[in-house]
A protein has these predicted regions:
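Polyanion-binding surface elements
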Residues: 7-35
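Hydrophobic alpha-helical segments with strong N-terminal bias
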Residues: 5-8, 43
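Major-groove DNA-recognition helix of helix-turn-helix-type DNA-binding domains
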Residues: 27-56, 63-64
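Short, structured secondary-structure boundary patches
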Residues: 22, 40, 55-59, 70-71
Length: 72
């Protein structure tokens, strides 16, 4: 049988993920980790979520934020 182990994660391309970690977002948007973390801390609820000590960037909302910003 071709069963997939339960503990093995299905890897999605970054462009298909709804929420990205700071590290993934830094790679996807070509923005530094520190800058993204600062943006996430200052924009909780707008395009960022906090899960414990981890920030998640909501990709579609962050894309919209970037398209409306002249500088970050």
């Amino acid at each position: 049988m071709n069963e997939i182990p339960i503990n093995e994660k299905a890897a999605l391309p970054l462009g298909e993920k709804y929420a990205l970690t700071i590290k993934e977002a830094a790679i996807y948007f070509n923005i530094g980790n520190k800058k993204l973390r600062r943006l996430a801390e200052n924009n909780l609820g707008r395009f960022a979520l906090e899960s414990g000590n981890r920030f998640l960037i909501i990709r579609p909302k962050f894309e919209q934020f970037l398209s409306q910003s002249t500088s970050i």
